[in-house]
Amino acid sequence: MMENYKHTTVLLDEAVNGLNIRPDGIYIDGTFGRGGHSRLILSQLGEEGRLLAIDRDPQAIAVAKTIDDPRFSIIHGPFSALGEYVAERDLIGKIDGILLDLGVSSPQLDDAERGFSFMRDGPLDMRMDPTRGQSAAEWLQTAEEADIAWVLKTYGEERFAKRIARAIVERNREQPMTRTKELAEVVAAATPVKDKFKHPATRTFQAVRIWVNSELEEIEQALKSSLNVLASGGRLSIISFHSLEDRIVKRFMRENSRGPQVPAGLPMTEEQLKKLGGRQLRALGKLMPGEEEVAENPRARSSVLRIAERTNA
């Protein structure tokens, strides 16, 4: 059954404007979600333009299939495989822009049955594609205590990672957790110091979700592929929602906006320097939501939009 949860697209105009849409261009929306970005891109494309959308959430795919437009196509899969999708369509080096809206969507958070939220009791799942891979409950029941602690520390930046991991393992030995409420209660009980502005389970839920969905690896692979598929002058427009995501995007754009790093004093000919290649991207800066958008949609508060352009190198 299709859910009817409202989804307000964050930095909608800014992210699409960052693509610098050409009416006859070919674009990728790597995170279709509920189609906010895709619909705006389509409204700016001419008859010859094309939009390829990607999402691994079956509910997003169902929404995408309601778009009756010959310029639009949808792929059910992870955006990390965008290089494969582009190669299959013989479009390597022909993509004029890629948009990624990272992290979990509002409909996923608001639907208790998806298991993403500690605020709503539901199955402890957290998979963006519930048809593939281990659920959060399955992973927590089989993982070693040290591995759980590492995930909480690395992906949640949780200061009490070891205590929480121990509590999770002990609880699962007594009776396996299958509900989000159970995990939230275990985490709260294991947290010795409470933050009055943040639920004690916030970081744990973020960390487990990122691990279950391989979110950071997905981002890194998609960014790497983007250099191969983008046309000269093609744009990357990427919205991040927490520091772990933004760090990856920022580092990627910075590293690929530099020319070849040659030690001072190393004798090299012009020909040798050419072979090393020049910079592959030109970083065009970052944007953050204004006060009005944050007031209307509090989830936009932590978002950061970064834009870069593919160079000729």
From Swiss-Prot:
Identification of the protein by name: Ribosomal RNA small subunit methyltransferase H
Keywords carried by this UniProt record: Cytoplasm, Methyltransferase, rRNA processing, S-adenosyl-L-methionine, Transferase
BP GO annotations: rRNA base methylation
Main localization of the protein described in the UniProt heading: cytoplasm
Enzyme Commission number(s) from the entry: 2.1.1.199
Binding site for S-adenosyl-L-methionine: G35, G36, H37, D55, F79, D101, Q108
Catalytic activity annotation: cytidine(1402) in 16S rRNA + S-adenosyl-L-methionine = N(4)-methylcytidine(1402) in 16S rRNA + S-adenosyl-L-homocysteine + H(+)
InterPro entries registered for this protein in UniProt: RsmH, SAM-dep_MeTrfase_MraW_recog, SAM-dependent_MTases_sf
GO terms, molecular function: rRNA (cytosine-N4-)-methyltransferase activity
